[in-house]
């Protein structure tokens, strides 16, 4: 099954709910790619020996990896951490996440500042470009196991919105204007 993504409603209800508009407005992988979001569907049951994952890591220079179990039983200050993840922010580097178990949502802003909700389920690997406004939350299952990938030493420094003058944000916006200027292989 392919990645599911949609435009979100404006409700302030529980962030762990799907927040579909009525009627639903689904978002294609092509539209996500226009925003710089890349996607691969992999086999989470065999991630340690997955040649496709190894190739992605090699091609993109992802030389550091760790695993993160997010659930109330395994994370101290769980609610506080979720609140931090759900605060809209950017990063200087790509954010690369591979869902191995459970599920959750990455929300990204499109070029018209609308929220798009991306439902991460087992096997989904996404790359969010540096400079894109985004946030993360678990869904109602309250559990996700993610592989985090990095180029070099892991750095996860959020820069909360507004960041319009941040050089990475400016570069991202410039890239949107020029459609990123290169062909990127993902599916």
From Swiss-Prot:
GO terms for cellular component: cytosol; nucleus. Its cofactor is Fe(2+); Ni(2+). The modification N-acetylalanine is found at residue 2. SUPFAM superfamilies: RmlC-like cupins. Ni(2+) binds at residues 89, 91, 95, 134. InterPro entries: ARD, ARD_euk, RmlC-like_jellyroll, RmlC_Cupin_sf. GO terms for biological process: L-methionine salvage from methylthioadenosine. Fe(2+) binds at residues 89, 91, 95, 134. Its EC number is 1.13.11.54, 1.13.11.53. Binds either 1 Fe or Ni cation per monomer. Iron-binding promotes an acireductone dioxygenase reaction producing 2-keto-4-methylthiobutyrate, while nickel-binding promotes an acireductone dioxygenase reaction producing 3-(methylsulfanyl)propanoate. This is Acireductone dioxygenase 4. It comes from Arabidopsis thaliana (Mouse-ear cress). The lineage of its organism: Eukaryota, Viridiplantae, Streptophyta, Embryophyta, Tracheophyta.
């Amino acid at each position: 099954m392919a990645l599911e993504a949609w435009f979100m409603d404006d409700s302030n209800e529980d962030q762990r709910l799907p927040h579909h508009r009525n009627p639903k407005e689904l978002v294609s992988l092509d539209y996500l790619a226009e925003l710089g979001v890349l996607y691969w569907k992999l086999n989470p049951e065999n991630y340690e020996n997955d040649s496709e994952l190894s190739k992605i890591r090699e091609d993109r220079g992802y030389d550091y990896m760790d695993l993160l179990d997010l659930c109330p039983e395994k994370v101290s200050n769980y609610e506080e951490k979720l609140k931090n993840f759900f605060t809209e922010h950017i990063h200087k580097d790509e954010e690369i996440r591979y869902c191995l178990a459970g599920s959750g949502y990455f929300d990204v802003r499109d070029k018209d500042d609308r929220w798009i909700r991306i439902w991460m389920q087992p096997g989904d690997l996404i790359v969010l470009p540096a400079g894109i406004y985004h946030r993360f939350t678990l869904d109602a299952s309250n559990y996700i196991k993610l592989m985090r990938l990095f180029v070099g030493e892991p750095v996860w420094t959020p820069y909360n919105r507004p960041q319009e003058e941040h050089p990475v944000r400016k570069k991202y916006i410039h890239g949107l204007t020029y459609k990123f200027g290169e062909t990127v292989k993902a599916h």
